[in-house]
Amino acid sequence: MERNFIDGYTEWQSNPEIVGVNKLPQHATFMPYENFDEAKKADRFASSRSKLLNGKWKFKLYKNYAYRPSDFAQPHYDTHNWDTIKVPGSWQMQGYDQAQYCNVRYPWEGSEDICPPNAPTKHNPVGCYVKKVHIDKSLLNKRVVICFEGVESAFYLYINGERVGYSESTFHRSEFDISKYIKEGSNVIGVEVYRWCTGSWLECQDMWRLGGIFRDVYIYTTEKQYIRDFEVVAEPDVTLSDGYADILVKTNGSYESLSLDLSILDKDGNTVALDSQYANEDHQTKLKAIVTDVNVWSSESPYLYTMVITLKDNGMPIEYISQKIGFRKVEIKDGIIRINNQRVVFKGTNRHEFDCHTGRYMSEDVMRYDIEMMKKSNMNAVRTSHYPNDPKFLELCDEYGLYVIDENNMETHGTGWSTIVGCPQLPASRPEWEKACMERIKATYNRDKNVTSVVCWSLGNESLGGAIPKKMYQFIKDTDKTRFVHFECHRAPDEKELSDVQSKMYARPWECEEYAVTQRDGRPYILCEYTHAMGNSCGSTDEYTRLWDKYPCLQGGFVWDWVDQSILTKDENGKEYLAYGGDFGENPHDGHFCGNGLLFGDRKVTPKLCEIKKLYQNVDFNAIDAARGVIEVKNKFMFTNLNEYELHWSQSSDKGEFCSGTLVLDVKPGEKTVIDLELSRIKTECYLNLELKTKEDNEYCKAGHIVAEEQFVINEFENTYDELEVDQPLIVDDTYGSLRVISDDVNVRFERRERNQLYSIKVGGEELLSAPMRLNFWRALTDNDRGTRAGSRLGCWRDAGDTPGIFNNTKWSINNYKVLEDGKKVIITGGATVCTQPESKAQVIYTITSKGMEVDLQFYPDASLPEIPEVSVLFELPKDFENLTYLGNGPEENYIDRCNAAKIGLYNTTVNDLWVDYLKPQECGNRTGVRYATLVGNKKVFSVVAEPQMELNVCHYLPKEIENVWHQKDMPEYNKTVVRLIARQQGVGGYDSWGAHCNDMYKNKTDKTYRLKFQIRF
């Protein structure tokens, strides 16, 4: 609808009811095609009727609207001295302005004293874009439309100097009919982009706040009579035998001469259904088709048909459009979400559109990478947090098979937490915001209504309730009967009237179970956000996934979040690093709270994703008799028989694999079977490994990809620890300064003056230690630790162990020693007083032979003290101890509350490879279940064996050195190798990152004794 502009530019500045000027109505995503062959390929930008305007544009950034030239879009305006910028792309990612990361706060807080609905005026950069486009004479009698898929956050459009229109809402499409503004030959397109506008009050998502044209820009043409919109409902019958397609087509032009043909093609291009109808006088025509023996669409089998609609004028084709469609049924029945008659569990992730190189702009390659990684990680769902994603991403979700919660572009989190005096909660029931909110939900629906993978609409995020969200909810319920509605508004008193599902983010597992058992209100329960993946996190995720199997109404969740929102940049020395909030001098900001990804900012996989993949797998293996190889296998797929995969099994020990085989299991969805591998019984510890693998390449992975796996430990800890061999006689030299135990090749020395510590181990004349052995009770704070204020709350443990330069925090003693077995074994008994307040105690027994030394440590914390981050013994070795072999859980980093994906094996790695590049340096690289480990450096060997097991952490830094650094690039040059032999380290947690402790079962409480027993082999 056309309207006049208001003088004074109030569109962006102060009037929330103006959300667009001269914009075309929102419609489904489609492109007109010239012929049937073009249309059936369904490649929008391959259409001869479309022209992408992506690429180089002239660009200049101004401080605010008062500084920008009003005539920059005039054909005569000289822009040859302007910069060139890439479109699509955020301008901050190309050297202009400051990127600003904010979670809850609005980015202008503290810099401009404004309240809703006013937009900032002093610091509100305006980017002016200019591009010249050639228009052929043949297009002058056509309808020509320009489309912007995403502009942050508002813009005016100019053609040849004339102001065409205005639009806001960053993540929604904006289209303008420019037919009357263009001319033959060169045409000047001018776009005036405002970083913030009135609509920015509705865009307080946890993300980087950027600016610019960040999605595709293109022109397309139609005849004067054209298809303006269409809606498809494609569902199978109750038996999933036949598919029924109902299509409503809206046309423009004289209906008397118009008709429409429908063709539905299968994957092989065969026509499987047809229909033809004349246009109706209301310009809405219904087409119908039945596809017999239909292939239904699901995340497991995303079969897509191609629908082509031909518009004819007096029997002659004038336009073709197409759409990939899948037949699937989504319903809530008896309080359970079902897809194609089956209960679904959403094994999902949230995903912001963010790339460390390009900001908001997402290339198709990155989109495909993300989806392929999700599929490889057993994910079946994604939530487009917190706005509609690029239409191409949804097309790819159709193609690969992901269930989508399509979230509307509305979050007003900051109005509930604002430091701005007088700032009201939005939108609530405030009438001045109704139009903007309703336009946004309508735009989301209309753009994506034909997307098969969209199974749920989300009204927005963290915006509470009120009359306006109720109207948004009712619009969807009145308009779409084929999907359910979600809204994260748990704290709102009217929450039940706004969402078809219960969705409390970051609910604890016991809260979920309580809902299922005692508080269920008839709705299914989905965790729209859970297991906050900030830094070293995602502990206890298995506590959730177990509940999804146990209670039908608990139907999954979405990890927060997919990828760290970090920006690849360079420091003042030209060194590349991944930046977070505050690194660009911006204020306010929320630091590294943007680092919540299962992938790092450069999209490398984190160990957290390995855990999620394991917990999301669709096959359970349960041991009936693991030693014999009798295993129950349960198929948790909804539609897939396990005979589509191969089960590879192997039996191994620390010496390697010694038997293996392959099976194909015929197990239908939801059913179980028992396999018997008829293994021979073995007396020592060994491991039965099961891996279910793909037989062939598919859309997202190669043949041999592991979709499910399990390991069973047989004869756990049998024959993994032997007594030290007694060989050569020993000499005990007990002088005032030291106590030494000496053999031909070994010299073990304890300091005797003040510390009474194990001070030196020499083997073959080579020193193994760089510093005395000491107790350690600290780990470098994780992001979750910081969230619980562990630095101050547990600070009594930080220096409780022996710390260089700090004396009298642990007082060691040597009580006595004795020589046994004809002088070939020495036992030294000692202890330690740990100077906590009150004091804690330790006892230690050293047993030494010429072949090694056993350390048997028992620690008795005072029960009044808070939990202990870690109980360990710490060694500093020379830095050239780099190569590590260990028998324990791996290959990835693992912790006691995040080790489901870990398998016991003999792993060869390096100390540097154990390090994990979390956005802010923190505790990392741990290994649990370690039986033995050997470090090698410069021909020296440091070998330890645990009784029966320990945790192991090896890196080049002390814990306190790590937590004093804010970026990976600032980690200092290392000069040592730090080995922590750990009795027990606390879990990493992950319920949330702003106060949630790890589960009590994973805490190191002080009402118990801790024991660490190990040997150092010479």
What are these regions (language model features)?
Residues E2-F45, V104, E162, W201, ...:
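Extended substrate-binding grooves/exosites of carbohydrate-active enzymes
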Residues E203-I227, G574-E632, K636-G656, S680-Y721, ...:
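Catalytic cores of secreted or luminal carbohydrate-active enzymes
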Residues M93, C102, R195, S298, ...:
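Beta-strand/loop-rich accessory regions of lumenal/periplasmic or secreted enzymes
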Residues I182-E184, K250-E331, C686-E725:
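Extended acidic/polar, glycine-enriched regions
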Residues I159, D242-Y278, T285, I631-T662, ...:
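Beta-strand-rich binding/interaction modules
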Residues S90-M93, Q98, C102-A119, E168-T170, ...:
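An acidic-aromatic loop/edge-strand motif
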Residues M1-P107, V188, E192, W196, ...:
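Accessory carbohydrate-binding/adhesion or oligomerization-edge regions at the termini
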Residues R3-G20, L24, D43-R44, K58-Y62, ...:
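Accessory beta-strand-rich segments of carbohydrate-active enzymes
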